[in-house]
Amino acid sequence: MAFAKISQVAHYVPEQVVTNHDLAQIMDTNDEWISSRTGIRQRHISRTESTSDLATEVAKKLMAKAGITGEELDFIILATITPDSMMPSTAARVQANIGANKAFAFDLTAACSGFVFALSTAEKFIASGRFQKGLVIGSETLSKAVDWSDRSTAVLFGDGAGGVLLEASEQEHFLAESLNSDGSRSECLTYGHSGLHSPFSDQESADSFLKMDGRTVFDFAIRDVAKSIKQTIDESPIEVTDLDYLLLHQANDRILDKMARKIGVDRAKLPANMMEYGNTSAASIPILLSECVEQGLIPLDGSQTVLLSGFGGGLTWGTLILTI
């Protein structure tokens, strides 16, 4: 039986930093209001780079670290809700940029759960025995999706990309997973046109900015997602005490505080970086993972047992437990 492992990690963020003080110059807000409610103090914003540009930088870093060329890749899966275009896919643009002419490439849309869903999907490709190497990337330019006059959402999000190189392994690394969706609660987090421009339709295109019912999403995370994480651990071959780190979607520092208590783990096992990057949706978990490797918390030698969990629009939520 074939197994998969994460062999390399990388991330990339745009150069421009926008602080809470900067936002206070263009909207009715201040640093204390934002940081006390979210933990966020700044975010990176793309001036000219597209989602595929950010993802391409990550892909190049991954290949350089592994010492491989694009021609050695079998697939590219790119998780995003801010694609360059609906067609072609952002993943296809990345494929062309890095010369991965033998790889199939596609986008996956599962909002802030996107990277977890994409990594789970990629693991199945490797486990089939037909594929040996692939890139899994989360990339977002959310600065293009928010209404910059709406302080309830604009202050939360940032741009960035992160990803992993997934390769075949002789040993098992993926220990447990849980992927979930609940479309009946889809209206609490929306982005994009809900209507159509067509002479054959009576529908009108609705406002396309990202919209969120913050309280509902907050309650969903600390209730449903925490319960799902606990259940995934209970059904896995490990105990909660075996987890070295839990890398959760970086939406809000207060959510992480409550999740740690609900799951029954020390808050120190939940690293955070939303104070530097804001909420980068599908990019948040791979950026955090890459930083943990850079800081030496996760040596990338298979010695650490790590839980990854994303949650967001759809509603969607997903958890993976693996050794890294």
UniProtKB/Swiss-Prot annotation:
Q: Where is the signal peptide?
A: none
Q: Where would you find this protein in the cell? A: Cytoplasm
Q: SUPFAM superfamilies annotated for this entry?
A: Thiolase-like
Q: What domain of life does the UniProt record list for this protein's source?
A: Bacteria
One GO term in the molecular function aspect is: beta-ketoacyl-acyl-carrier-protein synthase III activity
Q: Looking at the record, which segments are called ACP-binding? A: 250-254
Major place of residence = cytoplasm
Keyword Hydrolase among record annotations? no
Q: What is its EC number?
A: 2.3.1.180, 2.3.1.300
GO CC: one term?
cytoplasm
Name the pathway: Lipid metabolism; fatty acid biosynthesis
Domain free text = The last Arg residue of the ACP-binding site is essential for the weak association between ACP/AcpP and FabH.
Spell out the family assignment given in the record's similarity comment: Belongs to the thiolase-like superfamily. FabH family.
Function of the protein: Catalyzes the condensation reaction of fatty acid synthesis by the addition to an acyl acceptor of two carbons from malonyl-ACP. Catalyzes the first condensation reaction which initiates fatty acid synthesis and may therefore play a role in governing the total rate of fatty acid production. Possesses both acetoacetyl-ACP synthase and acetyl transacylase activities. Utilizes short straight and branched-chain acyl-CoAs, with a preference for acetyl-CoA.
Q: How is the subunit organization of this protein annotated in UniProt? A: Homodimer.
Q: State what protein this is by name.
A: Beta-ketoacyl-[acyl-carrier-protein] synthase III
Q: Give the species.
A: Streptococcus pneumoniae serotype 4 (strain ATCC BAA-334 / TIGR4)
